[in-house]
A protein has these predicted regions:
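Conserved interdomain linker/interface between the two RecA-like ATPase lobes of SF2 helicase motors
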Residues: 168, 175-177, 182-194, 198-254
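Residues immediately C-terminal
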Residues: 72, 98, 150-154, 185
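Pre-Walker A (Motif I) flank of P-loop NTPase domains
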Residues: 31-37, 61-62, 102-103, 174-175
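Walker A/P-loop NTP-binding motif
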Residues: 27-34, 45-59, 79, 164-170
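Conserved pre-motif I regulatory segment
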Residues: 1-38
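The conserved Walker
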Residues: 41
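SF2 helicase catalytic motif II
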Residues: 109-111, 119-177
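Conserved nucleic-acid-binding Ia/Ib motif block in the N-terminal RecA-like helicase ATPase lobe
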Residues: 61-114, 191
């Protein structure tokens, strides 16, 4: 990965060395390409989102950030507002509507999908009734990027169509930044995005978990059962119950 002067200057927004997947995702943003980030938990997927906010607001473009749940939307709104005090942020959830004219709008995935769907209907019918929309601006000219957090929800049986329809309804020239820690077969989603037209997709992944993952189990049984076993038998019993688990811990003294 050879860093050019533009990228080197942009990377200085952070006071630490960026990992390869972060560098590639930022390169995609700087080149107005799509980026699909599939990185392990704790590896720093927020950095590409921050890069999108910095880059596109500096170009006087607006940014939309979506998540599948209100709690995450509220959390990111608070985090970004505290970190980027020179950028205006707004939030749209079923319970809250604040500053819809902001530089960066954070919302649930359904609100973006519904807005895109309504805008498409209004456009086809030559109807102009902005009161039907949760928010409104010129996507083609004013929107710089859409960030879709927890993008693995596209595989959800009940809600996955929300992400599919959002991708299909978004003007193809608008870059998408999708973030996930658990997305299976990301190359298929990348192909799906590219098939709608527009820029190519940079698939930015990690190969090693930065935060170790441990599996532990704990079993409780009635005291009357415990009294029937000696120490060795207890351990064998628990081992049978915990078979198939990655790790287990047996207390010596009960």
């Amino acid at each position: 990965f050879k860093i050019n002067d533009n990228e080197s200057s942009f990377f200085k927004n952070w006071d630490f060395n960026l990992s390869p997947f972060q560098q590639w995702s930022i390169r995609a943003l700087l080149e107005n390409k799509n980026a699909l980030v599939t990185a392990h938990t704790g590896s720093g997927k927020t950095i590409p989102a921050e890069a999108a906010i910095i880059h596109f607001t500096n170009k006087n473009k607006r940014v939309i950030y979506t998540s599948p749940i209100k709690a995450l939307t509220n959390q990111k709104f608070n985090d970004f507002s505290k970190k980027f005090t020179n950028i205006s942020f707004g939030i749209l959830t079923g319970d809250n509507k604040y500053n819809p004219e902001a530089d960066v709008l954070l919302m649930t995935a359904e609100i973006l999908r519904n807005t895109l769907f309504q805008k498409n209907i209004l456009k086809q019918g030559n109807i102009c009734n902005n009161e039907l929309l949760s928010f409104d601006f010129d996507f083609e000219n004013d929107l710089g990027c859409i960030i879709m957090d927890e993008a693995h929800f596209i595989n959800d049986f009940e809600r996955g169509r929300i992400w599919e329809e959002t991708i299909l309804l978004t003007p193809s020239k608008i870059p998408l930044l999708l973030l996930s820690a658990t997305l299976s077969r990301p190359e298929e989603l990348a192909k799906f995005i590219e098939n709608r037209g527009g820029p190519e997709v940079y698939l930015c992944s990690t190969v090693k978990r930065m935060v170790p993952l441990y599996h532990n189990g704990y079993i409780t049984i009635p005291d009357s059962y415990i009294k029937q076993f000696n120490d060795d038998e207890r351990k064998k019993y628990l081992k049978r119950k915990m078979r198939g688990r990655r790790s287990y811990q047996v207390e010596k003294d009960w």
